[in-house]
């Protein structure tokens, strides 16, 4: 009793909670303490209070109880017992014994059994070596708020080491390898930060059993017989911070199996040894409060991933894999997780040549590995409960994709066995500095894979309820833009998981194209025209561009699904139905391998496409030549011989079938040699019909005639900002099967026998576009003569011309003097005269099919008002008119009332342009009264730029303007207009109600920052 009493202060300070509980258990078994007394001691939160309580209880119970207390103390903390008796165990061990033990450890850390490890578990016979495959990790030090505050290297971490140090990271981040590396570095003696440690012990906590001493002996090496357990524990106390414990995997540790290791972490102040412990994110909450330093393992760097791949794979396989990763943004993101790098390499191992595996294959391997690797953790869990939890995890992922949710709450996992999802590694749990826990998949792409896997199982289930559920998810995908963006990865992994699921997906996508939202675009690609207007305004450039963007992205999505599918040939019929009538864009500078597979394995699908768009770029050659000139022309023999890559030739020319239509675009060619022309001829021959576009190609001059001679099947030609010789122009007008001709920015002099002289030869033309072409009055007259022969033309654009005298009079007369099929006429900024407008007005009865009439940006001088009046008065014959943009002149605003009266009879009008009409408050009120009657049911575009309306006038107009619910575009630009605050407020209210608005032009309106803050919305606002 006196011994305990005399040493009570030391006992209270040094026993520790773990030893107190162990002694309490012994005393309960020996009937010294009853259950109530045990509860009192164990419920104490402070270890000193617990120690004080048990000592006072024992002293009251007499000497026999005190002897039993000392017996238990001797068992559980022998070094403390010896110290209290005035005996030190440490002196019993010689320095030589310690040196021998340290050397044995160092030797162990350099043996093959320690350096070689199974990165995917012992069931898979793939071995990595720690020396050659370790890459420098990225570590982040965390503060008390659990925020990243500093990036650390491994050496930086060791130099700043505090105990306990907690290293957290999601599964597969390389935490175990990191601790093994530290042990190896200590053993080598080459790491300065580790030389201060006498011993470094690496322990796997999943295998910890018994006491600390027993675990060390079991996992590392047999400690010499001269060092007993009590002596060893005393040595640890004596060496203090010269001993480093590397404790791997607290998330797999069972504290009851080894209370001493638990105490080493949570009561580190008693042991005084240094500790680094790793854990997964979801288990961090169990030890975070005890950490003196917390570090997170960050993403693997791209250089580290490449180094690892090159180290573990033979050169050919490594280069193939690195090329595949370079082409895939998704794979590049996944390579930030070391385990995924390992899996990607492992799939290639044993192969004689590189095989480009699909992302589904990689994720499937990863998913199954997680389940297999952690199956031992689920003993006692019923198989049905386990499967139900996995299904719920898939449902969670699937719902998350559709609701754009990638962070989940407790209620989301409350209906299943949370432990199953966490221990398999499918979900990660985040609790640090959070009132409510957050659950996430380790990567967004992994959530999409899990969702796709689940959708596949639903679509192929034998249970009708599950099939209905799966089809319900497909029915939510009704917009092409959503399918090609939001749901593209989900569909990819669904198709990669099952042939039958792919069949269901492709049938749905074919139905979407037929009946769904074909023209729905993502916000970043919203069209100027809404879908409804496109149905009424036919053959417009806007419509064609919009459809091309949508259909191309849709087709690319289909090819990716084909690529991902587990069986290509079995689904040929479904894929062919999907590709029927669609288009595909190909960049010749980056033709992916899967296109060759697509053409080879599904030739019927490729030929089912409506047309292929192929782009060639000459800029690389031009820049190379400039560099050669800058260096005096050195190494000219190394210049590439052709612009046209042979890869493009092999893709098209080696193909055994024909495309319906091929659209080839040449851009920025500084020259075109004979081999290029031969290559183009081979490519052109792969299509039944050809469209050729030439943009900014100075080098085509003189060669275009040769190019066209290889085009036996061309029906559309567009030349933009590319000079032409007289031979080129003559050859263009000799291609009599042309249906579309578009010439832009052609500024060389018109020569006899050239373009304007001979356009009449192209009698099959249906569309003629001439923009910014240099010509004089004589050229215009010749052009007019040629137009008389173009009886099939339905679209004519003549824009941005100058100095053509009275040439427009002749052109307008040729266009309108006889009944024709013209549906669209654009005569924009082309010296249109009042006389030409009169001629047009008098001949409107010959243009009854006209849908779009654009005469904007033309100033009518003499007799302009009279001409405009006459045009307006005769407009009643244009029963299909949907878009009207008028010219301007002096006092044209006087014609507004007459115009609006006629427009009341044109309910299908969607676009009206009165640019530079200089409308005043009077006219804007007249216009407001017109719109107040709501005569135009689907009105969408209004251009009143160049007005003179005051704030009062605009305020009056706003009351009606806000009712134009279908509006997508307006232009109210003017000069130096300072709007009143009341107008700004009203404008902001109106704009918020125009939910379809995509662009508002208010150039010249003098807004300050406050004004802009209230009128800015989801639309594009142009003020300068």
From Swiss-Prot:
Stored InterPro entries: CARD (IPR001315), DEATH-like_dom_sf (IPR011029), LRR_dom_sf (IPR032675), NACHT_NTPase (IPR007111), NLRC4 (IPR042220), Nlrc4-like_WHD (IPR053882), NLRC4_HD (IPR040535), P-loop_NTPase (IPR027417)
Residues with Phosphoserine modification: 533
Keyword annotations: Apoptosis, ATP-binding, Cytoplasm, Disease variant, Immunity, Inflammasome, Inflammatory response, Innate immunity, Leucine-rich repeat, Nucleotide-binding, Phosphoprotein, Repeat
GO molecular function, one term: caspase binding
Outcome when changing residue 443 to P: In FCAS4; the mutation increases oligomerization of the NLRC4 protein; results in hyperactivation of caspase-1 with an increase in IL1B protein secretion
NACHT domain mapped to chain residues: 163-476
Binding residue positions for ATP: 169-176
Span of domain CARD: 1-88
SUPFAM superfamilies in alphabetical order: DEATH domain (SSF47986), P-loop containing nucleoside triphosphate hydrolases (SSF52540), RNI-like (SSF52047)
Modifications made to the protein after synthesis: Phosphorylated at Ser-533 following infection of macrophages with S.typhimurium (Salmonella). Phosphorylation is essential for NLRC4 inflammasome function to promote caspase-1 activation and pyroptosis. PRKCD phosphorylates Ser-533 in vitro.
A Gene Ontology biological process term: positive regulation of NF-kappaB transcription factor activity
Start and end residues of each stretch annotated as Nucleotide-binding domain (NBD): 95-298
Swiss-Prot/TrEMBL LRR repeat ranges: 578-598, 656-679, 735-758, 762-785, 787-812, 824-847, 848-870, 878-902, 911-933, 936-963, 965-985, 999-1021
Region called Winged-helix domain (WHD), residue ranges: 356-463
Primary location group: cytoplasm
Tagged with keyword Cytoplasm: yes
Outcome (variant: residue 341 to A): In AIFEC; results in a gain of function mutation with constitutive activation of caspase-1
Subcellular location: Cytoplasm; Cytoplasm, Cytosol; Inflammasome
Task of the protein: Key component of inflammasomes that indirectly senses specific proteins from pathogenic bacteria and fungi and responds by assembling an inflammasome complex that promotes caspase-1 activation, cytokine production and macrophage pyroptosis. The NLRC4 inflammasome is activated as part of the innate immune response to a range of intracellular bacteria.
This protein's domain notes: In an autoinhibited form the C-terminal leucine-rich repeat (LRR) domain is positioned to sterically occlude one side of the NBD domain and consequently sequester NLRC4 in a monomeric state. An ADP-mediated interaction between the NBD and the WHD also contributes to the autoinhibition.
Subunit-level organization: Homooligomer; homooligomerizes to induce formation of the NLRC4 inflammasome. Homooligomerizes following activation by pathogenic proteins. Component of the NLRC4 inflammasome, at least composed of NLRC4 and caspase-1 (CASP1). Some NLRC4 inflammasomes contain PYCARD/ASC, while some others directly contact and activate CASP1. Interacts (via CARD domain) with PYCARD/ASC, pro-caspase-1 (CASP1), NOD2, BCL10 and NALP1 (NAC) by CARD-CARD interaction. Interacts with EIF2AK2/PKR.
Disease: Autoinflammation with infantile enterocolitis: An autosomal dominant disorder characterized by neonatal-onset enterocolitis, periodic fever, and fatal or near-fatal episodes of autoinflammation. Affected individuals tend to have poor overall growth and gastrointestinal symptoms in infancy, recurrent febrile episodes with splenomegaly, and sometimes hematologic disturbances, arthralgias, or myalgias.
Protein name, entry field: NLR family CARD domain-containing protein 4
């Amino acid at each position: 009793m006196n011994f305990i009493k005399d040493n009570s202060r030391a006992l209270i300070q040094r026993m520790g909670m773990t030893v107190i509980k162990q002694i309490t258990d012994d005393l309960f078994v020996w009937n010294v303490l009853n259950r109530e007394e045990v509860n009192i001691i164990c419920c104490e939160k402070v270890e000193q209070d617990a120690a004080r309580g048990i000592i006072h209880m024992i002293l009251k119970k007499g000497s026999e109880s005190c002897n039993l207390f000392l017996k238990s103390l001797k068992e559980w903390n022998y070094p403390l017992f010896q110290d209290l008796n005035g005996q030190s165990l440490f002196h019993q061990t010689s320095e030589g014994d310690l040196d021998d033990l340290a050397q044995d450890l160092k030797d162990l850390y350099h043996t093959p059994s320690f350096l070689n490890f199974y990165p995917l578990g012992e069931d898979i016979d793939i071995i990595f070596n720690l020396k050659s495959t370790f890459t420098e990790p990225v570590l982040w030090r965390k503060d008390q708020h659990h925020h990243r505050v500093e990036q650390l290297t491994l050496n930086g971490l060791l130099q700043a080491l505090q105990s306990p140090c907690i290293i957290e990271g999601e599964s597969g981040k390389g935490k175990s390898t990191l601790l093994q590396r530290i042990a190896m570095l200590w053993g080598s003696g080459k790491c300065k930060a580790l030389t201060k440690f006498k011993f470094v012990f690496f322990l796997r906590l999943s295998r910890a059993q018994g006491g600390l001493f027993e675990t060390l002996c079991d996992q590392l090496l047999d400690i010499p017989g001269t060092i007993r357990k009590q002596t060893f524990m005393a040595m640890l106390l004596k060496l203090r911070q010269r001993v480093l414990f590397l404790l791997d995997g607290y998330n797999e540790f069972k504290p009851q199996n080894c209370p001493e290791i638990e105490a080493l972490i949570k009561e580190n102040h008693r042991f005084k040894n240094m500790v680094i412990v790793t854990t997964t994110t979801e288990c961090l909450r169990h030890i975070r409060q005890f950490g003196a330093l917390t570090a997170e393992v960050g993403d693997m760097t791209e250089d580290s991933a490449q180094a690892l791949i090159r180290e573990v794979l033979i050169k050919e396989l490594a280069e193939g894999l690195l090329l595949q990763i370079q082409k895939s943004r998704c794979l590049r993101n996944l390579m930030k997780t070391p385990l995924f790098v390992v899996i990607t390499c492992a799939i290639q191992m044993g192969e004689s040549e590189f095989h480009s595996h699909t992302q589904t294959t990689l994720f499937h391997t990863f998913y199954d590995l997680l389940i297999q690797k952690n199956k031992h953790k689920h003993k006692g869990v019923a198989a049905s409960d386990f499967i139900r939890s996995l299904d719920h995890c898939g449902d969670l992922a699937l719902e998350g994709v559709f609701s754009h949710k990638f962070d989940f709450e407790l209620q989301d996992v409350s209906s299943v066995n949370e432990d199953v999802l966490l221990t398999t590694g499918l979900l990660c749990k985040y609790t640090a500095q959070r009132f409510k826990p957050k659950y996430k998949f380790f990567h967004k792409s992994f959530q999409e894979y899990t969702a796709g896997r689940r959708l596949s199982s639903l679509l192929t289930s034998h249970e009708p309820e599950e099939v209905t559920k799966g089809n319900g998810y497909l029915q939510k995908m009704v917009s092409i833009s959503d399918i090609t963006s939001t749901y593209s990865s989900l569909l990819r992994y669904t198709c990669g998981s099952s042939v039958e699921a792919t069949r269901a997906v492709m049938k749905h996508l074919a139905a979407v194209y037929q009946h769904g939202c074909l023209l729905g675009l993502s916000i970043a690609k919203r069209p100027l025209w809404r879908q409804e207007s496109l149905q009424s305004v036919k053959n417009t450039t806007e419509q064609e561009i919009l459809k091309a963007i949508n259909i191309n992205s849709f087709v690319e999505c289909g090819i990716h699904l084909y690529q991902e599918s587990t069986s290509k040939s079995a689904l040929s019929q479904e894929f062919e139905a999907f590709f029927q009538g669609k288009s595909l864009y190909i960049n010749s500078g980056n033709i992916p391998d899967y296109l060759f597979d697509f053409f080879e394995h599904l030739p019927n699908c490729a030929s089912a496409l409506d047309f292929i768009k192929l782009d060639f770029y000459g800029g690389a050659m031009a820049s190379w030549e400039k560099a050669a000139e800058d260096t005096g022309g050195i190494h000219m023999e190394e210049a590439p011989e052709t612009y046209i890559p042979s890869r493009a030739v092999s893709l098209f020319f080696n193909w055994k079938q024909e495309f319906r239509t091929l659209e080839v675009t040449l851009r920025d060619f500084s020259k075109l040699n004979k081999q290029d022309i031969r290559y183009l001829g081979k490519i052109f021959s792969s299509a039944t019909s050809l469209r050729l576009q030439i943009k900014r190609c100075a080098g085509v001059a003189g060669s275009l005639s040769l190019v066209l001679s290889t085009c036996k099947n061309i029906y559309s030609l567009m030349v933009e900002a590319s000079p032409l010789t007289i031979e080129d122009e003559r050859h263009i007008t000799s291609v009599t099967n042309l249906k579309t001709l578009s010439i832009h920015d052609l500024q060389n002099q018109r020569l006899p026998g050239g373009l304007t002289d001979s356009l009449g030869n192209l009698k099959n033309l249906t569309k003629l576009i001439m923009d910014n072409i240099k010509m004089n009055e004589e050229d215009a007259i010749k052009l007019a003569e040629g137009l008389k022969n173009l009886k099939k033309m339905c679209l004519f654009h003549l824009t941005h011309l100058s100095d053509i005298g009275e040439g427009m009079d002749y052109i307008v007369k040729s266009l309108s003097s006889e009944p024709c099929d013209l549906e669209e006429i654009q005569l924009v900024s082309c010296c249109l005269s009042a006389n030409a407008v009169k001629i047009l007005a008098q001949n409107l009865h010959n243009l009854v099919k006209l849908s779009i009439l654009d005469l904007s940006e033309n100033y009518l001088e003499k007799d302009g008002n009279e001409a405009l009046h006459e045009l307006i008065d005769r407009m009643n014959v244009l029963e299909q008119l949907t878009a009207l943009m008028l010219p301007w002149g002096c006092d044209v605003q006087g014609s507004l009332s007459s115009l609006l009266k006629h427009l009341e009879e044109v309910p299908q009008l969607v676009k009206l342009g009165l640019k530079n009409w200089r409308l005043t408050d009077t006219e804007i009120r007249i216009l407001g009264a017109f719109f107040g009657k709501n005569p135009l049911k689907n009105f969408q575009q209004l251009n009143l730029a160049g007005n003179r309306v005051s704030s009062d006038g605009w305020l009056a107009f706003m009351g009606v303007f806000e009712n134009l619910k279908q509006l997508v575009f307006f232009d109210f630009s003017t000069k130096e207009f300072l709007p009143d605050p009341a107008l700004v407020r009203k404008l902001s209210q109106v704009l918020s109600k125009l939910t379809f608005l995509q662009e508002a032009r208010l150039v010249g309106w003098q807004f300050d920052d406050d004004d802009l803050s209230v009128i800015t919305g989801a639309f594009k606002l142009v003020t300068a």
